[in-house]
Amino acid sequence: PPLKLYAQGAVLMDATSGRVLYSKNGEEQLPMASTTKIMTLLVALENSNPEDVVTVSKTAVSEEGSSAYLKPGARITMRDLCYGLMLNSGNDAAVAIAEHISETTDDFAEFMNDTAKRTGILNTHFVNPNGLHDDNHFTTASDLARLTRYALQNDTFREIVSSGMYTSTMLMPDGTIQNVEYINHNRLLKELDGCIGVKTGFTKTAGRCLVSAVNRNGAE
């Protein structure tokens, strides 16, 4: 029977060869919601050390939408921020990462766009690190597949997106330690055999978005 897809755009790619096996509106520019964070994580891993300690700003904490439960003035490692970014889809974590690497989210977005060009992601434009809606923030299903194929070559990226759960540690301004448990929002990790996970996303404008990778008998 013909494939019934409700998604506006979809692509199935062989990760080894990069060959597109199936495409529905694969080159159509669409909003991407939190799948943006695939690029945020990639830029973070390529331009910082996992053991870097980040002091969380009030700006990061005040970011709307899904949260990694950061607190202003708390100190947290870049590694823990990356898990909060991908498992809890923390918009606050995205801003904290951006400010650590580039001082402002605008400068970080330019970093994201430069990385996109360098990796052959040519029909995508980033305005922010978390995917909150902006008419000038868009991608294509094909670009997300290419980006994820590239990012999964990074072992730390692969380790983070395939984790079901992670406990982060924050040093609070008063000297106390606060642990936060992150649970991966991607249900396919449990429900689909061989799923590596990658990133879910949702905004009212973008609808439900998903980028996922699967390994079956060594093929991805």
Model-predicted segments: where are they?
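Penicillin-recognizing serine hydrolase domain
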Residues: P1-L5, T104-E220
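Second-shell loop/turn segments in exported
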Residues: K24-P31, G65-P72, D80-G84, A94-E103, ...
